[in-house]
Amino acid sequence: MKYTLKILKGSNEFVLKELLSKYPNTEILEEYDERILFESDIEIDEYRNLYSPTHISNENNKVLNLSRRDWRREFVPAGINPSLAYIMCMIADLKQEDILLDPFCGASTIPITAIMYFDIKRCICIDISDSAIVKSKQNFLNAKIEENRYKLFRKNIQDIKLNKRNIDVIISNLPFGIRVGTHDENVQVYTKLEDLANRLLRTKGRIVLLTQEKKLIREVFKNWDIHSITQIDEGGLLPEIFLIKRK
């Protein structure tokens, strides 16, 4: 049977990595910016455990929405696509013992993804919005995640008082200053984020950030080892995913 995976533009490498790690006998036929064609004897419904593509279809025109998550019933404006959240977790190279911080958690798509599909130890979810925290709580309940594996805080990033250096990874969908916030606000917010990371991140910790503010993120993290991993086409915007580590 021939299949087509619909993917986010810029995510080929990660979709192929997931597909071939879970189904190593897959025969890749063709690759394009927004789709991958492959052949396999496996039935289409078995591919529901692929989380980085957005859709899969077969030659009989049956289509599955792979980005839909049953637990994700609450949403926030400018929230992250669940497939993209999964890709960011792949880039972070998550481990079971990791403690994750998302300081702009929205409805907690990234933290829930990290716990459910990468089995990390625990996550700390922070957002300035009361509504986001309420929606996060509901999504965690929907996902049936034990309460001792997550903490939710309604805080402005400038008011976060955590000081213990025990965070293994920070993953976040940052304010772009386009759909949410402004560039001037982002200068302050991103500067505070760098200070927070410097305070809380372990020596060998990792930071994975999605942002449209490409120049700003490089300026703010100029004393870190920062790399742009890929540019993603997300609804007409072209943010980049940055991987950042201590020098």
Describe the predicted segments one by one.
Residues 50-61:
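Conserved short beta-strand edge segments in small beta-sheet-based binding/regulatory domains
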